[in-house]
Amino acid sequence: MRSITALFFLFCFLAPSALAQLRTGFYSRSCPRAESIVASVVANRFRSDKSITAAFLRMQFHDCFVRGCDASLLIDPRPGRPSEKSTGPNASVRGYEIIDEAKRQLEAACPRTVSCADIVTLATRDSVALAGGPRFSVPTGRRDGLRSNPNDVNLPGPTIPVSASIQLFAAQGMNTNDMVTLIGGGHSVGVAHCSLFQDRLSDRAMEPSLKSSLRRKCSSPNDPTTFLDQKTSFTVDNAIYGEIRRQRGILRIDQNLGLDRSTSGIVSGYASSNTLFRKRFAEALVKMGTIKVLTGRSGEIRRNCRVFNN
């Protein structure tokens, strides 16, 4: 109950324009089963593929940090009309078929009512809970964007300095605490290819036994993957922060969160309290989900998440 209350007060401090028509239970009358339909689709896939939590966390981050949470990432490229989806780091985002299935069922139940942007938000929230993370309410009422341009994509890489990452998050209305929470929480269930952390394999700021293990794995020419959280790889919890404190962060940005004076205290706080992490992670996800949203008459409600209506 306390976490729900905290989230209620969080809504009150978010940008008024974002909250003007976003609210918890937005579809309670227009499509009463909306949230349960999305939850069912996500749960069905989670039973056979627990990695979808990482996929959805990445999908929502990549969507919201490019022109806001408007499902512009979901638009398929066409001949002569490229989109965000196939550009740079977005090329490896996955989970679109789960969004498609949720949309198909929602269109059958409530045609042209539930936005693709809300489906992404709900699916991410539900997958986090399934992976042992916090359960929380999210406001809905987003509309889908009318633009998906690869030139808009400017997402951080795994070697971004902490100071630059702080600036990038600040440009989206997110503070340093939000940044540490979302990066660590998102990476608590993710994987990375060796090519993304080759620079760490000669880094003195990596625990020696982990470094040796990764060097052996990454000697393969097939660019294998490894879990970013070596301790609880499929659970959304605070374990990754403890790993970072023990110099076992895989990506440079992860480890640097524990070394930089502006973020190390936050890492230590989360490492010592999963309760604190769970509360802050729920709050940060809700806050990220309000970045530059379209509401009211702006945008559209897509019939198919992969294409604009016109």
UniProtKB/Swiss-Prot annotation:
Key words, A-Z: Calcium, Disulfide bond, Heme, Hydrogen peroxide, Iron, Metal-binding, Oxidoreductase, Peroxidase, Secreted, Signal
Subcellular location: Secreted
Signal sequence bounds: 1-20
InterPro entries in UniProt: Haem_peroxidase, Haem_peroxidase_sf, Peroxidase_pln, Peroxidases_AS, Secretory_peroxidase
Enzyme Commission number(s): 1.11.1.7
Cofactor: binding comment: Binds 1 heme b (iron(II)-protoporphyrin IX) group per subunit.
Pfam families to which the protein is assigned, alphabetical: peroxidase (PF00141)
EC main group: oxidoreductase
Binding residues for heme b: 187
Primary role: Removal of H(2)O(2), oxidation of toxic reductants, biosynthesis and degradation of lignin, suberization, auxin catabolism, response to environmental stresses such as wounding, pathogen attack and oxidative stress. These functions might be dependent on each isozyme/isoform in each plant tissue.
Protein family per UniProt: Belongs to the peroxidase family. Classical plant (class III) peroxidase subfamily.
Other observations noted: There are 73 peroxidase genes in A.thaliana.
Name this protein carries in UniProt: Peroxidase 44
